[in-house]
Amino acid sequence: MIFFSILITIFAYFLGSISSAILICKILRFPDPRNFGSKNPGATNILRIAGLKIAISVILFDILKGAIPMWLGYHLKISPIFLGATAVFSCLGHMYPIFFKFYGGKGVATAFGVLTTIDLHLSIVMISSWTLTVLSFGYSSLGAIVTAFIIPCYAWHFQSQYLLPTIIISSLVVIKHAANIKRLWHHKENRIWRK
């Protein structure tokens, strides 16, 4: 079982490394998101580059990247320790993809896919927190940052055995938003609807 647990964790990283934002833009002949807009291969930048439908497809793909390895792990009944590792490596794959020179997205949708499989309450908290923040202030990045700080508290309450991986994932999300935090501080961050 340890062998399969390690295999799933490795699979999670490689699946996470498939960047839907880059591939979809390449197939549909949109600009490379790494060289356009915020230069982030994530759904918010895709929204600005290619529109809502393409952005939604990127979000769905990124959610599945996080959810599929976790579902597989649950099905094979691997231990919570390896499930936690699978969760972290899914997000690491998205953020630092081996197929794209380790330059990836910020992991929000993939983290959502991971946390949804851990506990439905966590996905509800993520959606609510992100939506309320974005509707209040208009910044997708701020929604992600606020949610990253909040979600470990709920993980501790609902699924305490996954608190550590949740803290690691949340920390990674905040780290990947370092440039956004600087722009927010200096009032230079673009709102979600601005191209």
UniProtKB/Swiss-Prot annotation:
Entry-linked InterPro entries: G3P_acylTferase_PlsY
MF GO annotations: acyl-phosphate glycerol-3-phosphate acyltransferase activity
Pfam families, alphabetized: G3P_acyltransf
Principal place of residence: membrane
GO biological process annotation, one example: phospholipid biosynthetic process
Compartment(s): Cell inner membrane
GO CC annotations on file: plasma membrane
Highest taxon above the source species: Bacteria
Bilayer-spanning residue ranges: 2-22, 54-74, 80-100, 107-127, 132-152, 155-175
EC number: 2.3.1.275
Keywords per UniProt: Cell inner membrane, Cell membrane, Lipid biosynthesis, Lipid metabolism, Membrane, Phospholipid biosynthesis, Phospholipid metabolism, Transferase, Transmembrane, Transmembrane helix
Catalysed conversion reaction: an acyl phosphate + sn-glycerol 3-phosphate = a 1-acyl-sn-glycero-3-phosphate + phosphate
Bilayer topology term: Multi-pass membrane protein
Pathway: Lipid metabolism; phospholipid metabolism
Subunit-structure text: Probably interacts with PlsX.
Function comment: Catalyzes the transfer of an acyl group from acyl-phosphate (acyl-PO(4)) to glycerol-3-phosphate (G3P) to form lysophosphatidic acid (LPA). This enzyme utilizes acyl-phosphate as fatty acyl donor, but not acyl-CoA or acyl-ACP.
Protein family (similarity comment): Belongs to the PlsY family.
Listed name of the protein: Glycerol-3-phosphate acyltransferase
